[in-house]
Amino acid sequence: DLIKKGLSFSTPTGTAYEYSNLGYAMLGYIIKRVTGKPYEQYINETIIRPLGMTSTYWEFSKIPKRQLAHGYRWINNNWQEEALLSHGAYGAMGGLITSLEDFIKYMNLHMNAWPPRHDTEATVAKRSSLREMHKPWNFSTLNAQYKYPGGRPCAVASAYGYGLRWTSDCEGRTTVGHSGGLPGFGSNWTFLPEYGIGVICFANVTYAPTSIINTKVLDTILAISKIKPRQLIPSRILLQRQQELMEILPGWNTKGKNIFAENFFLDYSINALRSEANELFTKAGQIKQVKEIVPTNNLRGAFIIEGEHSNIEVRFTLTPEQVPLIQEYRIREIPK
């Protein structure tokens, strides 16, 4: 009836981001129309049960009393209990009742989508589909004055994915997660895809600042633990091309070396390449070791040649053909 009467829009459709509880209630109705099942039944069958979430409910009256948390609001210097809300059409936007132990299973589903790989897929959703949810599809804000709860200034860009909030800060840290609140409750879950860590905060206080709490917790964990982002494992072809490049450096004797794209030497003069490499190797002195390539992706990376007096960085990019060949090459001195 609400939709039949017509809706009022804050902005012209498709022009701006604005969160809408009504939008998620409509999605719940769409699930029913498409599947022929109430959205809660469909979600139970396709997500909740396959993940083994045995302490997750839609209706508070079905929860064992010893497991049910009651919500409160701080009013006039006193805690007042909030009435629990019964399940209904708007449950699609915030009606799920769960435990930390259960929700960890759901968060792990998202965390296990990273890093991208070709392992056996999960039964609930493909990793690629989950990563689609994690993308910043709709930019919302850039807060150049943002400060972490500890007071450290760091600009943060925010966007919205598929039902999830996305942020990226001045240190290159990306977070994905979601917050929620109802009278008597507040919640947030946030994870860092490139670090493999996440936190969940549930509170039985009206609109508790769980997002701020989790942000501070994650920032503290990273500061104390010194955890670094995941490192991509070099592909076999990157390792192979690195070895083959080292076999021709610095003299650039490419005879019998079919490792370059057909247009490589149209972009580069072999005499200039040879002169540049010889000069850098002479400056470096005796070569101590060649470090393993650090990949940017499966077809691009850089490695360091450690010399007695200076180091050398070599970067290269491969073509996307079946047997990738060197398309782009850069070399430079890294002073010690």
Give a label for each model feature.
Residues 177, 188-191, 195-204, 313-315, ...:
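Short, well-ordered beta-strand elements
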Residues 292-336:
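Exposed beta-sheet edge and beta->alpha loop/turn motif
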Residues 103-106, 255-257, 316:
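Hydrophobic pocket/interface hotspot
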